[in-house]
Amino acid sequence: MAKVYYDNDVNKEYLKNKKIAVLGYGSQGHAHALNLKDSGYDVVIGVREGQSRTKAEEDGFQAYDVSEAVERADVTVVLMPDEVQQRVFNEEIVPHLKPQSALVFAHGFNVHFGAIKAPDDVDVFLVAPKGPGHLVRREYVKGSAVPALFAVDQDVTGDAKALALNYAHGIGATRAGVIETTFKEETETDLFGEQAVLCGGITKLIHYGFETLTEAGYQPELAYFEVLHEMKLIVDLMYEGGMEKMRHSISNTAEFGDYVSGARVITPEVKENMKQVLADIQSGTFSRQFIEDNNNGFESFKSMRSTQAGHPIEKVGADLRMMMPFINNN
C-alpha cells in the first residue's frame, strides 16, 4: 500500500529562512507561489518579460529573469512546460544554481528520461498536485487541499525528503495527504493515463461513437449529446463515488447495457494495445518522439492538432453549446 504523509508528519523548519524561486507563472506556477507565500515563505518569481511577469508583480511578488531568480534561490522550482525545460535548464538554471540547494519539479518527465541532468551537488525532488493550478489554489484558500505525489531523485544534503514534505505542506497538499512515489512511477503512470485513457483513449472512443451513429443516419446533434455531452454527467458520478456510485445513479437499462456491451467494445485486444503504449513510454520511445518533434518545430504535433480540430463533432458541438449558456456561465 502507498505511504501517505499528512501535516503532522512535516517538520516545518526546513523551508524556514530559505528563498524559493518559482520559475514560471502559469497554471501550477501561480498556485504554488501564492500558496507558499500565504504559508509564510519567501518566494520570488523567475519569468521573462510579459503578461506573466506583470501578473506576478500584481500579485505582490518580486519577479526577475530566470537566471537572476535562480541566483537568489535556495530552492528552485521548475514549473515551465516540459518542452522548454531542457533549454532553460541548461542555459539559465544550471550556471546559477547554488551548491547544496534544491531543485523541485511538478512532473518527472525531463529528469526521468534524461533530458535534464542535475548537478551532483543539489537535492532533486518533485511535488505533483493531482489537480490543475486553479483547483490547487482554490482549495488552499478554502482551508482544504488537493492531494499530491512526492518523490526524491537525488539527496545530497540528507534532507531532501524532509524538504519535499515541507514544500508539499507549503502548498497545502499535506492537509489532504501526499503519497510517496518515484520519478519513474510518477512519470510513466501519468503519461500512460493521459495517452491510453484520459486524453487519447477517451477522445478516440467519442469519435468512433459519433461516427458510428452519424454513419448509420442519425442526426449529428443527437450523436453529440449521447457520446460527448453526457460524458460529463457520468464522469462526475465516478469522480464523486467511483463506478459503484455511477451505476447506482443510472437507470437499470443503462446499467444492464454497461455489463453486456462494454466488453464488446473495449475488448481484450484493447488491453494489449494499452500494454504496448505503456511499453513505448517505459522504453523512452514516446519521450524521444516528443522531444524530436519539438526540436523540429512541433511539425507533426501541429498537423495532428489541426486534423483533430477539423473533426465534424467540433462544429456540431460548437453550435449546440450556443444553446446551453449555463456551460459558459460555469
UniProtKB/Swiss-Prot annotation:
Family matches, as PROSITE patterns: KARI_C, KARI_N
Keywords: Amino-acid biosynthesis, Branched-chain amino acid biosynthesis, Magnesium, Metal-binding, NADP, Oxidoreductase
Amino acids binding Mg(2+) 1: D190, E194
GO BP, sorted A to Z: isoleucine biosynthetic process; L-valine biosynthetic process
Alphabetical list of Pfam families matching this protein: KARI_C, KARI_N
Gene Ontology terms: cellular component: cytosol
Annotated pathway: Amino-acid biosynthesis; L-isoleucine biosynthesis; L-isoleucine from 2-oxobutanoate: step 2/4; Amino-acid biosynthesis; L-valine biosynthesis; L-valine from pyruvate: step 2/4
Residues annotated as domain KARI C-terminal knotted: 182-327
Residue ranges occupied by any KARI N-terminal Rossmann domain in the UniProt entry: 2-181
Signal sequence, renumbered to the chain: none
Name of the protein: Ketol-acid reductoisomerase (NADP(+))
